[in-house]
Amino acid sequence: MPIKIPDTLPAFETLVQEGVRVMTETMAIRQDIRPLQIGLLNLMPNKIKTELQMARLVGASPLQVELSLIRIGGHKAKNTSEDHLLAFYQTWEEVKQRKFDGFIITGAPIELLPYEDVTYWKEMQEILDWTETNVHSTMNVCWGAMAAIYHFHGVPKYELKEKAFGVYRHRNLKPSSIYLNGFSDNFEVPVSRWTEVRRADIEKSDSLEILMESSEMGVCLVHEKRGRRLYMFNHVEYDSTSLSDEYFRDVDAGVPIKMPHNYFPHNDPALAPQNRWRSHAHLLFGNWINEIYQTTPYDVEEIGMDL
């Protein structure tokens, strides 16, 4: 089944060209099926690029998915036009009465700030609490994952001496996990962050389980056993050129930055990088969507009633 998004969303044509099945509102009405309701709380500056990355993974599922784009109400985006936001986004205040089968919270380029200094931290806390009653399963990514695991479990973040930046080998620590179905024993994942969470802090909670880890970059994916929450601290959703874009952005701005590790062929920035993580990104999101489908109530309004 395809993903349902507005046919004027910039990601629509790109997804069609990539072979992802998408549908319009008219097409969706003709299908006698309840689509999975997935919300995307997009905290990234380049919202259009992030929309495409997430829609690409969610839309690859054989299930019909309706993707709702959501933004923080009290924060003005600097890198996305107001016209785009008004056309395609709702604020959390506008959707907080709804129920969602799945909810994605993205990263944000604010990881060096203490959580309490983030201008929208209060609203972020309200959203995280709201997911407990209005969302069946949540996928938290990068800063979104750090914020969520801090909010729910008090797991702190630690500033790194230098940016963790590149493509790193990771280990599958729980091959029997429903979220790692089909995963290799080891695989590569893009990393781009200035902070980290640590295994010792996570292991203090009996309800958290580490599923992916790197000997160089530490914890990558954590599963909350009872809360149906995933914490992904790296960027499986990244495009082939995402790290390259970040690298050249900083180089052009005169910001000190090391070349991303294990990324450019022969460490030559003039050569196009190869995507070596795409298949596992699709596996992770496909497994997540499938688990939602298997466990969410048929009546979306019953979500949260089992708590």
UniProtKB/Swiss-Prot annotation:
List of catalytic residues: 142 (acyl-thioester intermediate), 235 (proton acceptor), 237
UniProt-annotated site: Important for acyl-CoA specificity, residues: 111
Biochemical pathway: Amino-acid biosynthesis; L-methionine biosynthesis via de novo pathway; O-acetyl-L-homoserine from L-homoserine: step 1/1
GO CC, one annotated term: cytoplasm
Enzyme Commission numbers on file: 2.3.1.31
Annotated InterPro entries: Class_I_gatase-like, HST_MetA, MetA_family
Superkingdom as given in the UniProt entry: Bacteria
SUPFAM superfamilies assigned to the protein according to its UniProt record, in alphabetical order: Class I glutamine amidotransferase-like
Assigned keywords, A-Z: Acyltransferase, Amino-acid biosynthesis, Cytoplasm, Methionine biosynthesis, Transferase
Entry function: Transfers an acetyl group from acetyl-CoA to L-homoserine, forming acetyl-L-homoserine.
Similarity field: Belongs to the MetA family.
NCBIfam families: metA
Name the UniProt record assigns to this protein: Homoserine O-acetyltransferase
Organism encoding this protein: Rhizobium etli (strain CIAT 652)
Lineage: Bacteria, Pseudomonadati, Pseudomonadota, Alphaproteobacteria, Hyphomicrobiales
Gene name for this UniProt entry: metAA
